[in-house]
């Protein structure tokens, strides 16, 4: 420890490096050895675990391995552990020869290797099979013990009498007996199926293998016994799932307790040594505790194990919070459940933990601690606590005494009157003479000279024969001296008194209750004890013990007692009889028989599978036993050198001393992992196989001795993928087919109940009813039953019961009926039952339902709503409709009846589209100007064409729109998923005679070419296929617009208005695939509303299937595809010649085209179909792709997609495409998430329309019930005052006074655990209601200046568009002028300076990124360089010089002050924003949000200062949204530092943090001098210019105050690892991080003191702004500092310095009148003067109240603006506001009137108000939030006494 402290003191690297050199030298050899022995690259999360096992791996390896940790454990087992155990020549079994050779090089005692092929995979590991058993007395079995039964190990020892020790490695999770959940899931996982445990090492599925599920029983036995044969089992070591066991021969040693003395002494301190000891083993698991079982419930143990640290933290949290809600424990658990360290905890365990914590919150220990109290008080407390127990104990005893009187009568002494005397005269005397000893009957004994016992007569009663013990004792004592007693004065008679006197005596009386009463009392007492036990709570001690046992359980330990195992018989170790061998065999392959290596070993059922070329090492599957039938069958075909016939084996050895109740650790069953040495027998059952066996024909035709037999056995083909498409029934549930109330096949209703029905009304599918009615309740939406009941006079209940006799229950109770009500299908069934026909009058016209062969008729009206509704009777109309229909009616009827491949067109009705003249005029205007389209730009002057040019035609259309009204045209919309077949049915429709007069409009030439090819028309008809521009110039009866959403907005309206002959429009498109965006920055087409929302009501059906995409893509979207090809989703490094390339930009597309590849942009590929896999190019623009473009790219090809480019763009990070990442990782693409506002409104259909059913429902669906996420809904609004979910509310202690903490009950559950919610220790300062009296000054004299006159000519006339910039071909919008009001000058006053409005300027943040952010080159943390350390030290020394501090002196940490800072920080966070704002930002405390990730957004502001007035485009200020954890943890650190800075700061240094304008004025008047010039400085990109030296400076500042080290490390980690949605950032300053202002101010002050010899010169600093009173000399070391700085200075020598928007000088400070004048102009034109006037007035009064001296502060150029502002306030302010310009002190009532209804107040205006008014104003929700609260600053000043 002392050496470590010395190292920490050596800060300079020149001193530290030599000190560390010996340490480095001592570690070189160990690191080199570790890298050579364990060269594998181990995951960093597993490295600490391996080191804790004692494995010396450094983690610096570079070789990759699929399960590197297992490989490391295996290497340690072989080369270290086993090598140490192999002290004599030994044999090794089940190991690859190459690995054995390396092992033999480590230790030469490893002499021979024996391998046995018992599994097909063994042929890849073992080149040969050993025919005999090992010969050495020590054997090492490598990873095979889990496949062997103890009876087989016993057989091995019996076959090899010289075998003494068997070292075996066992790979089995010790927790396998608990559940299938691993305690170390990163190291291994496993599952148990029946009797098989499937083990997966480190997620490597190819290296997984199977083993018996009872293999873990090897860890539960300590010996194996068979008759007189004993084997001891010892666990030598465990490394997680790998265990080293030693099985050795011999009788186990006797228990030491048998050798101890037989009669130990009671006081023996070593008494436990003489008791039998248990053989207990334990295994390492994560630190966990076991939750108690729920009352009367059984929960699995694995689901009750939770991390101890989380449990303790949650226990403390639930009792520390003031108000606990039901959701708070769950939110606390969520914070920890996502941590990697807790991945072993099951979801049920997390659920049980939060439930356990929630339900046990009210429990508290019933204890008291009374120390300083009297014994009487302690006794009273004891009686109060234990009176029930004492009473319950005393009552039976007292009741028993009543019975004791019957058996042991006790005399009771009673007083008796013997004589009464008065005036010395005896009035009464008892007959018997009085004697003092009469009570003892001594006179009788003296006269008789016998004892009292002999004087008792035989006839005396029993109670007289038993004198009392006291009486007997007195007789024995007094009898020897009785003669002397008579002579004493005691027996002399005394002289009687004159006064009345009574003489009393004591007489013993015997008393006993009747035995009946005694029994009653005894029974009552016993009953009271019983009732006390049943109804009274446990005793205090029991409550205390139960509370701590229930709520503070101990750590869970995975341990058990090992027991001996007795086996009845042995089982053969090998499936064949081994030969006898005395010498190790030769391992060379030349000595092997040709056929032996592959055919001499039988094939057991497969236990493991390995598809990789590299077989597993530690996890490899060793040989496993096989079934009896297989072994016997294969043994009959063995070809061995010995010709001795195989004889039946001897009978197994039986054990007669097996206890009948012994635990069955290894069950004797015919499992696939065991075998028996018996001859072939018929098994009782077929064991479970992990892979299909070979066919019978193959076995019969294969010679077992064939050398190729092994390869045949090892060849198993994988199952082929299904070639048939996924049926639609697999997408949706089919309750009808599984309905138990139905019978028979699914058929149309008209076939099951044949009658004459109107067409397509009885074609719905159903089944025959098989069961009687179940009396289902009527649906809520039963308007159809009411309408039918009103017409037929049959009750609704009877109608409903009738439906239950003909339709199955699944068609009467489902989601459709619950949400939409009954439909016309049910009406058809009722019409059949009651023999009537119904006419439905709907928007589609009259429709008939029911059989036509009936004479009964009813009328029902259907209204579409919403909601839809059935009502009885016929709809009444005001007039008959016109007999003449629309010209397009015949076309629409033909479309409704048209079929393609037996399917109808997917639409319901044609919708009348009223054209919009404004939309059409917008588009034609942009076409005319060349902003959209190219027709107006075509040069036709050189051609021979006559007539108007295209531009002239467009102009004519423009003129035509000016004089012609709009019209209404029928529109039919076909919409569906990509590749659903929207185009093909329309192409077939257009080939019919009725639709021959058509034309097609396409967005691209590629799509037009596809139409031409598909229609196959004559060349003269090619004019019918057009691009979207040329189509407008042509005319036809029918217009088909393909990909309508890729057309400009307003195109539908323009096409209809431009063609008077047009009768019908058919539009095709998918609203999910995006819409048109103009490439011209001057186009105004984007100002029109989106066509996706405008055309959405025309979508009757959305086809949710595809004929194009392959199955792999269909699974992503969860959609049915008719394309049977599986397809691919992969990646390529270079494009293929035949594959189309899809790019993000036109430039990339042109590049690939020039390189010889077929390429187009993703957007332009919409509508195209590719046969080859589409190659998607990934580049920097991929992350900006919209969801629509991502959908287009993934659905273009019939074969799949391949990504080309950096994999980071599909890695699921901030810089990748979310949809591409889901596709690349085979994750489901949830459409509701990518299209939240559009997809839920689409009415999906999942299969083509085979019938055009006129089905009507009783309600209108709000969204299709198909493919809807159940969680897709808006969260309910919960009032902020909601308290019904409170579980507990802890009261405030009486001595604490009123509660000063703010409410936290409204905080999001994920944020509440981050609050300490500590009560402040300091008393809150009283709220001041006084106003600072102004100093008496002479009123300033203003030159006359009319505000309106100056404002009229202030703004020069200019074109605002010239001040905008282009970003990615899109213009910025910082100078909006269109439709903006103006009254002061010729243009809106808002054009004075740039306005940052992120909501109206999409380019604001993207265009500002390069200027405001600095990015790291990679995701790696920012590296602190040596220059950063040196510069940081220099700045720290300069900062200490500024504060007159010693750099080497540290300040002790003050915990009490830091606790106050925590409370203050939480107060600031809760009071700076409204409760609604905090709740709306609940995502800031999301546990899934990494604390190193910040969200960058643009600050909305209209900044007006000298630098922005009349300026051009300006980059916005970026704000960083950090996790609440960062703000609440590091915020107190900054406040803690600020308190010490306020104490140490010299008076000549001014920091503007938390200061009011009046304080600024006072300081200037006190410190600034009249010397000129003054040095004002500002920096360019100050935040971005701070690099690693700022982190070093901040860390040194915190170390000086001894801030806890973990907080310093957190700060450094955040600064060096910060990342955003745009990429990783350097350690630049972020506006929004804790202490931004303080750190910037300190950095600025440190730079100033590094540059100048300041001395006592007045200095003003505020962030990056600074002011020095007069020029100063430069320090000698400034050049060395300057060369390391990255700052860019903007020094200014001026006589009128500007600081924080105020002109300052010895006279005080005054607000910049030029900026204030501009703000007033903007407020007037924005019509916001009433909201802002008060703020501007209070800022103006700061300088106005200086009097005549204010003119010394202003430049001459600003005098007119100061006068104009004064003129403005005098003319525009009401009288009570003008009083603020007076020198007199404003009264509180006046200020209350002024601020009665504020809506907008600046920070400076708030500073000038009293505290009472500030608190009243901040309580109003409409006021803005301030990052710096005056109350917080005032509270900080109250904490200064801690450091004084």
From Swiss-Prot:
Species of provenance: Turnip yellow mosaic virus (isolate Australia)
Protein name as annotated: Non-structural replication polyprotein
Positions with biased composition (Low complexity): 725-736
Polar residues bias: start-end ranges: 631-641
Annotated ranges, domain (+)RNA virus helicase C-terminal: 1104-1236
UniProt: a ribonucleoside 5'-triphosphate binding residues: 976-983
Disulfide bridge positions per record: none
Domain (+)RNA virus helicase ATP-binding: 946-1103
Any Pfam family hit: RdRP_2
Any one of the GO BP annotations: mRNA modification
Site (described: Cleavage): 879-880, 1259-1260
Domain RdRp catalytic: 1572-1678
MF term (GO), any: RNA-directed RNA polymerase activity
Chain positions covered by the region annotation Disordered: 571-739, 860-888
């Amino acid at each position: 420890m002392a050496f470590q402290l010395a190292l920490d003191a050596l800060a300079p690297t020149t001193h530290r490096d030599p000190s560390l050199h010996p340490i480095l030298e001592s570690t070189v050899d160990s690191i080199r050895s570790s890298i050579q022995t364990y060269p594998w690259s181990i995951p960093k999360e597993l490295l600490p675990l391996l080191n804790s096992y004692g494995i010396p791996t450094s983690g610096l390896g570079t070789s990759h391995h699929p399960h590197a940790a297992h490989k490391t454990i295996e290497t340690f087992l072989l080369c270290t552990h086993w090598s140490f155990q192999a002290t004599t020549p030994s044999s090794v079994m089940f190991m690859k020869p190459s690995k054995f050779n390396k092992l033999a090089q480590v230790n030469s005692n490893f002499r021979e290797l024996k391998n046995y092929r018992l599994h097909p995979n063994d042929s890849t590991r073992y080149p040969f099979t050993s025919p005999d058993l090992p010969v050495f007395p020590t054997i090492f079995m490598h990873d095979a013990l889990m496949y062997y039964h103890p009876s087989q190990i016993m057989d091995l020892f019996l076959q090899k009498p010289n075998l003494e020790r068997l070292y075996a490695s066992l790979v089995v999770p010790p927790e396998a007996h608990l559940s299938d959940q691993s305690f170390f899931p990163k190291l291994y996982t496993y599952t148990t199926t029946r009797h098989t445990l499937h083990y997966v090492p480190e997620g490597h599925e190819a290296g997984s293998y199977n083993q018996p599920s009872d293999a873990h029983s090897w860890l539960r036995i300590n010996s194996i016994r068979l008759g007189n044969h004993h084997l001891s089992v010892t666990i030598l070591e465990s490394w997680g799932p790998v265990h080293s066991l030693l099985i050795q021969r011999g009788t186990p040693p006797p228990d030491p307790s048998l050798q101890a003395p037989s009669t130990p002494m009671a006081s023996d301190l070593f008494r436990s040594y003489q008791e039998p000891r248990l053989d207990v083993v334990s295994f390492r698991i994560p630190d966990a505790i076991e939750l108690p079982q729920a009352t009367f419930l059984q929960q699995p143990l694995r689901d009750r194990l939770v991390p101890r640290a989380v449990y303790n933290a949650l226990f403390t949290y639930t009792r520390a919070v003031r108000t606990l809600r039901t959701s708070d424990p769950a939110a606390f658990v969520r914070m920890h459940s996502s941590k990697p360290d807790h991945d072993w905890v099951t979801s049920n365990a997390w659920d049980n933990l939060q439930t356990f914590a929630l339900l046990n919150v009210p429990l508290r220990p019933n204890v008291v601690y009374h120390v300083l109290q009297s014994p009487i008080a302690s006794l009273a407390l004891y009686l109060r606590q234990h009176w029930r127990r004492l009473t319950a104990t005393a009552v039976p005893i007292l009741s028993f005494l009543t019975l004791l009187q019957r058996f042991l009568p006790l005399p009771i002494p009673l007083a008796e009157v013997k004589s009464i005397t008065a005036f010395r005269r005896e009035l009464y005397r008892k007959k018997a003479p009085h004697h003092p000893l009469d009570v003892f009957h001594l006179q009788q004994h003296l006269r008789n000279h016998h004892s009292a016992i002999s004087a008792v007569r035989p006839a005396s009663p029993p109670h007289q024969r038993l004198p009392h013990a006291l009486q007997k004792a007195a007789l024995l004592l007094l009898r020897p001296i009785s003669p002397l007693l008579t002579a004493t004065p005691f027996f002399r008679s005394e002289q009687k008194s004159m006064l009345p006197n009574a003489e009393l005596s004591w007489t013993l009386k015997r008393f006993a209750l009747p035995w009946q009463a005694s029994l009653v009392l005894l029974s009552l007492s016993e009953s009271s004890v019983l009732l006390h036990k049943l109804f009274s709570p446990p005793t205090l001690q029991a409550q205390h013990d139960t509370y701590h046992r229930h709520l503070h359980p101990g750590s869970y330990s995975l341990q058990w007692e090992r027991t001996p195992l007795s086996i009845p018989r042995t089982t053969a170790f090998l499936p064949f009889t081994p030969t006898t061998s005395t010498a190790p065999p030769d391992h060379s392959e030349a000595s092997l028989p040709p056929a032996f290596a592959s055919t001499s070993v039988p094939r057991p059922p497969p236990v493991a599978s390995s598809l990789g070329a590299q077989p597993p090492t530690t996890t490899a599957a060793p040989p496993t036993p096989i079934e009896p039938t297989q072994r016997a069958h294969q043994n009959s075909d063995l070809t061995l050198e010995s010709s001795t016939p195989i004889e039946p084996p001897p009978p197994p050895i039986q054990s007669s001393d097996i206890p009948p109740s012994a635990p069955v650790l290894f069950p004797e069953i015919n499992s696939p992992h065991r075998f028996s040495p018996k001859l072939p027998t018929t098994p009782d059952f077929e064991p479970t196989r992990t892979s299909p066996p070979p066919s019978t024909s193959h076995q019969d035709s294969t010679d077992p001795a064939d050398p190729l037999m092994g390869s045949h056995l090892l060849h198993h083909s994988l199952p082929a993928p299904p070639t048939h498409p996924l049926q639609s029934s697999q997408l949706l549930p089919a309750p009808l087919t599984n309905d138990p109330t139905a019978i028979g096949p699914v058929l149309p209703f008209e076939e099951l109940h044949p009658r004459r029905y109107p067409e397509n009304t009885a074609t719905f599918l159903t089944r025959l009813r098989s069961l009687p009615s179940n009396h289902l309740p009527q649906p809520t939406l039963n308007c159809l039953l009411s309408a039918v009941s009103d017409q037929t006079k049959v009750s609704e209940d009877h109608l409903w019961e009738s439906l239950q006799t003909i339709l199955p229950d699944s068609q009467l109770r489902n989601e459709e009926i619950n949400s939409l009500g009954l439909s016309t299908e049910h009406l058809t069934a009722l019409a059949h039952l009651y023999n009537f026909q119904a006419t439905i009058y709907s928007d589609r016209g009259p429709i008939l339902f029911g059989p036509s062969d009936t004479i009964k008729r009813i009328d029902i009206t259907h209204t579409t709503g919403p909601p839809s509704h059935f009502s009885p009777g016929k709809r009444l109309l005001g007039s008959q409709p016109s007999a003449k229909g629309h010209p397009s009616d015949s076309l629409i009827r033909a479309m409704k009846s048209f079929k393609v491949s037996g399917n109808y067109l997917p639409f319901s009705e044609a919708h009348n589209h009223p054209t919009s003249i404004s939309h059409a005029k917008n588009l034609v205007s942009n076409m005319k100007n060349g902003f959209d389209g190219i027709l107006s730009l075509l040069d036709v002057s050189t051609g021979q064409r006559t007539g108007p040019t295209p531009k002239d035609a467009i102009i004519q259309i423009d003129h035509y729109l000016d004089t012609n009204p709009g019209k209404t045209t029928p529109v039919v919309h076909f919409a569906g998923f990509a590749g659903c077949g929207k185009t093909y049915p329309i192409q077939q429709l257009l080939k019919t005679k009725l639709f021959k007069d058509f034309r097609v409009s396409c967005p691209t030439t590629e799509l037009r070419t596809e139409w031409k090819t598909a229609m196959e028309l004559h060349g003269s008809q090619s004019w019918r296929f057009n691009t979207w521009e040329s189509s407008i110039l042509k005319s036809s009866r029918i217009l088909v617009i393909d990909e309508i959403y890729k057309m400009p907005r307003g195109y539908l309206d323009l096409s209809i208005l431009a063609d008077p002959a047009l009768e019908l429009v058919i539009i095709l498109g998918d609203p999910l695939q995006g819409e048109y965006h103009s490439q011209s920055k001057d186009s105004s087409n984007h100002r029109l509303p989106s066509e996706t929302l405008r055309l959405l009501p025309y979508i009757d059906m959305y086809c949710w299937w595809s004929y194009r995409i392959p199955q792999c893509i269909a699974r992503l979207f969860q959609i049915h595809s008719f394309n049977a090809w599986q397809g691919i989703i992969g990646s390529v490094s270079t494009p293929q010649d035949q594959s189309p390339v899809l790019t993000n930009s036109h430039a990339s597309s042109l590049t690939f085209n020039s390189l010889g590849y077929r390429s187009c942009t993703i957007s332009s590929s919409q509508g195209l179909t590719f046969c080859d896999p589409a190659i998607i190019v990934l580049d920097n623009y991929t992350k900006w792709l919209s969801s629509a473009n991502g959908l287009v790219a993934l659905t273009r090809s019939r074969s799949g997609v391949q990504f080309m480019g950096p994999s980071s763009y599909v890695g699921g990070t901030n810089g990748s495409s979310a949809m591409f990442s889901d596709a690349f990782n085979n994750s489901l693409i949830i459409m509701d998430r990518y299209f939240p506002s559009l997809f839920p409104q689409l009415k999906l259909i999942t299969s083509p329309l085979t019938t055009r059913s006129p089905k009507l429902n009783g309600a209108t669906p709000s969204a299709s019930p198909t493919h809807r996420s159940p969680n897709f809904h808006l969260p309910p609004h919960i009032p902020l005052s909601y308290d019904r979910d409170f579980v507990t509310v802890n009261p405030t202690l009486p001595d604490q006074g009123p509660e000063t903490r703010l409410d936290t009950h409204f905080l999001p559950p994920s944020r509440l655990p981050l609050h300490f919610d500590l009560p402040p220790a300091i008393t809150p300062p009283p709220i001041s209601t006084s106003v600072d009296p102004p100093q008496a000054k002479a009123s300033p004299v203003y030159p006359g200046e009319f505000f309106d006159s100056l404002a009229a000519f202030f703004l020069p006339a200019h074109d605002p568009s010239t001040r905008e910039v282009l970003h990615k071909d899109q213009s910025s919008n910082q100078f909006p002028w269109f439709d903006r009001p103006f009254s002061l000058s010729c243009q809106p006053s808002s054009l004075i300076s740039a306005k940052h409005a992120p909501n109206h300027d999409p380019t604001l943040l993207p265009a500002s990124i390069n200027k405001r952010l600095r990015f790291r080159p990679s995701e790696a943390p920012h590296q602190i360089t040596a220059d950063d350390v040196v510069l940081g030290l220099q700045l720290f020394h300069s900062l200490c010089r500024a504060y007159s501090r010693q750099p080497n002196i540290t300040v002790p940490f003050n915990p009490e002050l830091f606790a106050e800072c925590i409370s203050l920080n939480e107060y600031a966070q809760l009071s700076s924003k409204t409760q609604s704002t905090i709740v709306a930002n609940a995502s800031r405390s999301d546990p899934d949000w990494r604390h190193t990730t910040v969200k960058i957004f643009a600050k909305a502001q209209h900044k007006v200062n000298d630098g922005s007035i009349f300026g051009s485009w300006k980059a916005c200020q970026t704000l960083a949204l950090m996790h609440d954890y960062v703000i609440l943890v590091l915020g107190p650190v900054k406040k803690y530092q600020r308190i010490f800075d306020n104490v140490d700061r010299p008076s000549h240094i001014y920091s503007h943090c938390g200061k009011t304008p009046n304080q600024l004025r006072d300081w200037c008047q006190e410190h600034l001098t009249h010397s000129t010039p003054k040095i004002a400085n500002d920096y360019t990109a100050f935040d971005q210019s701070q690099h690693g030296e700022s982190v070093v400076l901040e860390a040194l500042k915190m170390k000086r105050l001894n801030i806890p080290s973990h907080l310093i490390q957190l700060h450094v980690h955040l600064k060096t690892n910060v990342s955003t949605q745009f990429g990783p950032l350097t350690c630049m300053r972020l506006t929004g991080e804790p202490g931004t202002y303080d750190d910037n101010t300190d950095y600025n002050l440190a730079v100033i003191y590094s540059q100048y010899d300041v001395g006592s010169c007045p200095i003003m600093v505020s962030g990056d702004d600074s002011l020095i009173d007069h020029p100063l000399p430069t320090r000698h070391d400034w050049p060395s500092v300057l060369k390391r700085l990255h700052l860019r200075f903007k020094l200014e020598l001026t006589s009128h310095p500007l600081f924080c928007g105020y002109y300052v000088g010895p006279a005080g400070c005054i607000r910049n009148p030029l900026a204030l004048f501009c703000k007033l102009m903007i407020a007037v034109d924005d019509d916001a003067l009433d909201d802002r006037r008060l703020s501007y007035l209070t800022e103006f009064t700061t300088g106005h109240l200086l009097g005549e001296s204010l003119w010394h502060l202003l430049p001459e150029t600003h005098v007119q603006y100061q006068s104009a502002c004064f003129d403005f306030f005098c003319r525009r302010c009401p009288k009570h506001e003008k009083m603020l310009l007076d020198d007199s002190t404003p009264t509180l009532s006046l200020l209350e009137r002024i601020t009665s209804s504020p809506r907008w107040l600046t920070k400076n205006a708030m500073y000038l108000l009293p505290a009472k008014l500030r608190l009243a104003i901040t309580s109003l929700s409409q006021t803005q939030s301030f990052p710096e609260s005056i109350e917080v600053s005032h509270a900080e000043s109250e904490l200064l006494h801690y450091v004084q």
